[in-house]
A protein has these predicted regions:
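Phosphate/diphosphate-binding loops
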Residues: 160, 208, 215, 223-224, ...
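A conserved beta-strand->alpha-helix junction
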Residues: 135, 140-143, 312-323, 420-438
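Secondary-structure transition/capping motifs at alpha-helix termini
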Residues: 131, 151-152, 282-287, 306-313, ...
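Short, glycine/charge-rich flexible loops or terminal/linker lids adjacent to PRPP-binding catalytic cores
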Residues: 309-354, 364-365, 392-398
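Generic beta-strand/beta-sheet core signal
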Residues: 111, 174, 182-183, 194, ...
């Protein structure tokens, strides 16, 4: 699963980027776009560029700089790219995107951000009908549906496939003639459109446009498909109207997205500041300093400090070169890994009552270790504040998460969690406070399934999920 056993965090599965421009070095533009999206996936990366006839593909494991040592060299005007978080079992080069296929309708390269909830059933049917799969990704279901579609054009084939899949999917696809962007009917994952001087770009987040000096135009709507070619940009609503029900993942604002992005018109940075202000309004703790667990809680901690007048301090220093591990550690190894990544500063925390802010608690293991570390460094009291409600349910819409029984808030009260992590106080931001923080997006347009179990699209059973992970 895309869960970091050291830092007790969920992770976004991936980021996607695409370019259509006849005047620029497309491969370089895709590379820099992916570089800006590196936070959305650090285990593999891939770039596919095309001139409409041939496709040049480069991909590899690791960070972008490790995965792609040389850019593809084909003279091209279209390209798509992908960065991905892999899982323990799917650390396989065959699963690196974009997926490129040649079929009777032409050629396509597909980059997918999200998770299909009906992929297993479709895959079984396709295999029964003779399809052969080369990877264990649900994304390969999409390319098979496109290839088998009876529609006349590649764009119509893509729309036909999109109507058959369910769950979370933001797609960036190159065909022989066009760059295509598709967002699922719920809009679980973000996707936006930008403009270069002579072309257009698609991205999971707007922050990637700044890297190539592209202008943000708008977010792609749920259920929408945009087609970019030499005629410009065309838009169509491919989804049936009754299936469009916007439910953007609220965790994009809490943790996943980069602070300098805007999603559905709402600044991620301002939203996180608001979360900190709402936390202060709900707690009114009397403390000496406000701190974050870097980096995910930092902006909310700044918001808390500004609202309260309590000074913000950096009492935990992060080692940015410690890397990431998928080894399932025992308690001793986990504590060592946390100490390798974070170090408490006695001269900052000694004798202090500390408001400590993080974005979420998944299993509670790391929070307890950090509280222990701060108290060993001389902290007097720790008031733990979480800038989201308690996570009680798994996510099935693009974040591979723990099964519910492994989520500490699913089986423990807040007081029990406080005692488990040995904090003096513990407070989770209320759903109402979170909605006030994300004030630019209506509550009805946000997905809170990981907090309240309200899954708007049918999700697989745990048995089906187990089959999926065995495949991976």
């Amino acid at each position: 699963m895309n869960y970091d056993p050291i830092f007790d965090k969920w992770h976004e599965e991936c980021g996607v980027f695409g370019v259509f421009d006849r005047t620029v070095d497309v491969a370089r533009y895709v590379y820099w776009g992916l570089f800006a999206l590196q936070h959305r996936g650090q285990e593999s990366a891939g770039i596919a560029i095309t001139d409409g006839n041939e496709v040049a593909l480069k991909k590899g494991m690791g960070l972008l700089t490790e995965a792609i040592k040389e850019l593809p060299t084909l003279k091209s005007h279209m390209g798509t790219g992908h960065v991905r978080y892999s899982t323990t079992g799917s650390n396989n080069p065959r699963n690196i995107q974009p997926l490129v296929i040649h079929y009777q309708g032409g050629q396509i390269a597909v980059a997918h951000n999200g998770n299909l909830t009906n992929a297993l059933g479709i895959r079984r049917q396709l295999e029964a009908d003779g399809s052969i799969f080369q990877t264990t990704m649900d994304s390969e279901v999409i390319v098979n549906l496109i290839a088998r579609s009876k529609a006349d054009t590649q764009e119509e084939r893509i729309a036909d496939a999109a109507r058959q899949i369910e769950g979370a999917f933001s797609l960036v696809i190159t065909t022989n003639d066009s760059l295509v962007g598709v967002r699922d009917p719920q809009g679980f994952r973000p996707l936006c459109l930008g403009k270069t001087e002579h072309g257009y770009v698609l991205s999971s987040e707007s922050c990637a446009f700044d890297a190539i000096k592209a202008e943000f135009i708008r977010d792609i709507d749920p259920g929408e498909m945009v087609i970019i070619d030499d005629r410009g940009v065309r838009s169509t609503i491919y989804a049936e109207p009754e299936k469009i029900d916007k439910k953007l993942c609220v965790f994009e604002y809490i943790y996943f997205a980069r602070s300098d992005s805007k999603i559905d018109g709402q600044s991620v940075y301002e939203t996180r500041l608001n979360m900190g202000r709402e936390l202060y309004n709900e707690t009114k703790y009397d403390a000496d300093i406000v701190m974050s667990i870097p980096d995910s809680g930092t902006t909310a901690a700044l918001g808390y400090a500004r609202a309260s007048g309590i000074p913000f301090a950096e009492g935990l220093i992060k080692n940015r070169y410690s890397g990431r591990t998928f080894i399932k550690p025992n308690q001793e190894e986990r504590e060592l890994a946390v100490r390798m990544k974070l170090n408490a500063m006695p001269e900052v925390v000694g004798g202090k009552r500390i408001v400590l802010i993080d974005d979420s608690i998944v299993r509670g293991t790391t929070s307890g270790l950090i509280v222990k570390m701060l108290k060993e460094a001389g902290a007097k009291e720790i008031y733990m504040c979480v800038s989201s409600p308690a996570i009680e349910y798994s996510c099935h819409y693009g974040i591979d998460t723990s099964v519910r029984k492994e989520l500490i808030a699913a089986t423990h009260t807040i007081d029990e969690i406080r005692d488990y992590i040995k904090a003096d106080k513990l407070h989770y931001l209320s759903k109402e406070g979170l909605c006030r923080a994300v004030s630019g997006v209506p509550e009805a347009d946000l997905c809170f399934a990981c907090f309240n179990g309200d899954y708007r699209v049918d999700v697989p059973t745990e048995q089906e999920e187990g089959v999926k992970y065995v495949l991976e």
